Regions:
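A short, glycine/Asx- and small/polar-enriched loop/turn
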Residues: 41-45, 71-78, 120-126, 134, ...
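Dinucleotide-binding Rossmann-like beta1-alpha1 core, especially the glycine-rich loop
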Residues: 1-67, 77, 196, 217
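Flavin (FAD/FMN) cofactor-binding core of flavoprotein oxidoreductases
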Residues: 66-69, 161-164, 170, 174, ...
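Short beta-strand to alpha-helix junction loop
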Residues: 2-12, 36-46, 81-100, 111, ...
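General small-molecule cofactor/ligand-binding pocket signal
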Residues: 61-63, 109-111, 281
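Helical element adjacent to the flavin cofactor pocket in flavoenzyme catalytic cores
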Residues: 81-138, 142, 146-149
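Glycine-rich active-site loop/strand segments that organize a redox cofactor
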Residues: 1-13, 24-28, 215-250
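Flavin-dependent oxidoreductases
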Residues: 119-227
Length: 297
């Protein structure tokens, strides 16, 4: 939403990311994206996206079907928002370069596979780990799937992390021409996720997805990965129960697409009718660390 911290982070962070990539000679591309309305009932939501973008200072425009097909010839739809300044980058390269810059400064350390066991606060913040104690003026919590555990160690009330697995398919090279850049649907206002979309990667490959299904473990990157204790903790959390009650219908659809490739393909065909099941091969899944308050928000 305009004025939110997320909006500020997107706008300022994008500019700083581009500058960092230029300085570090990391390959990136400003390729643009389209957000496509498939039917008349999606036009009000598309207009809202456009107005929010303009309010946030994002260069964007509503384009006709003719203009849309100039940008993405294989897309179905009746209208779209074009965001020409959207871009792509290999974030593993970005992370590796950040790590290099951190290590270059005297006294800095990066400790991988190191468990935090406690946090104390006096005049400074003391982090207790399996490899000793570390102290500083500030603690930046970037623990992802375990960020709520870190927050709890500071005795600060906060949200619980609910893990949602996002499953992807990679489009076979012979069909990469179906998507030139980035193609998104109009998000369902009744569901807190974006919906399946097409993403061209910086190496030229094309991926589609993700869906959004409850993972049965914090690191449940596959359907067969189950952690009974973590799952019980999720299912007994009041915030999750309220979230599930509100979005159960959409969630059931997401779960069905997880088990049915045909259903996944049908969702993709709303954007690109020419895509079919034979064009897709499984790609690695990701886990979204969704912060959920007791209220279900």
């Amino acid at each position: 939403k305009p004025g939110s911290l997320k909006a500020l982070n997107c706008r300022v962070g994008k500019s700083r990311m581009e500058n960092f990539c230029r300085q570090e000679e990391i390959n990136f591309e400003i390729c643009g994206k389209v957000i496509v309305a498939i039917s008349e009932d999606e036009l009000p939501a598309l207009e809202t996206i456009y107005q929010r973008g303009r309010t946030n200072g994002v260069r964007c425009e509503i384009i006709s079907l003719e203009k849309l097909h100039e940008l993405e010839p294989h897309v179905a739809g009746i209208q779209a928002v074009h965001v020409p300044e959207a871009g792509i980058v290999d974030f593993s390269q970005v992370s590796e370069r950040f790590a290099e810059r951190v290590r270059e400064r005297e006294g800095n350390k990066i400790l991988c596979s190191t468990k935090v066991t406690g946090i104390r606060q006096t005049s400074r913040i003391i982090i207790e780990t399996e490899k000793g104690e570390f102290e500083g003026r500030y603690l930046v919590n970037c623990a992802g799937l375990y960020s709520d555990k870190i927050t709890a160690m500071t005795q600060t009330p906060g949200a619980k992390i609910i893990p949602f697995r996002g499953e992807y398919y990679k489009v076979r090279p012979g069909k990469n021409h179906l998507c030139r850049n980035l193609i998104y649907p109009v998000p369902d206002p009744n569901f807190p996720f974006l919906g399946v979309h097409f993403t061209r990667m910086i190496n030229g490959s094309l991926e589609c997805g993700p869906n959004a299904v409850l993972a049965f473990a914090r690191e449940g990157y596959t359907r067969s990965t189950v952690n009974i204790l973590e799952l019980a903790d999720i299912l007994s959390y009041p915030g999750f129960m309220k979230l599930a009650a509100k979005y159960w219908k959409a969630g059931a659809g997401e779960m069905w697409r997880s088990f049915s490739k045909a259903a996944f393909v049908r969702a993709l065909q709303r954007l690109i009718p020419e895509i079919n099941a034979d064009d897709l091969e499984p790609a690695p899944a990701g886990i979204r660390a969704q912060a959920v308050m007791d209220s279900g928000k």
